[in-house]
């Protein structure tokens, strides 16, 4: 009769409700909502598919995957984005391992099996409490990505990466999708998310 209950507290069930975890997921959700709203108001772009991490199978799971279509005079182009939200919790070795995992995922064919395309931009958006911290973290991430690409002789992959520092409160202002706030790891020049390699 009724629903079964567990009569004792299980702290292990709360480990995923830390402040950092909740904030990460809130930023991720806001980013996906912002992408949806931005595409809705831009006739040349459509958001045709979106998936969040808990919907994705496999060993390598991006925080989010967004498939945009861009309509130009030359035709329609796919613009898939693997979004990764960086809260600055990973030091250099762990971050490099994260990037290496994404590279292997794309190069192995597993990405193509999961998303039916072999095209991808890997977009790392870092957050933090102060503008100085966010900018330093963005520069560090660009440096670490480029070091890894050089070590593996994959410098030509630099165009597949974008890194931005974002402010939580400004996620809905569309700057993430239309302004030059992104950086390739091999260039100090800001560009838009959808700028050609």
Which residues make up each language-model segment?
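Electrostatic, structured charged patches in enzyme active sites and in nucleic-acid/phosphate-binding
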Residues: 2-197
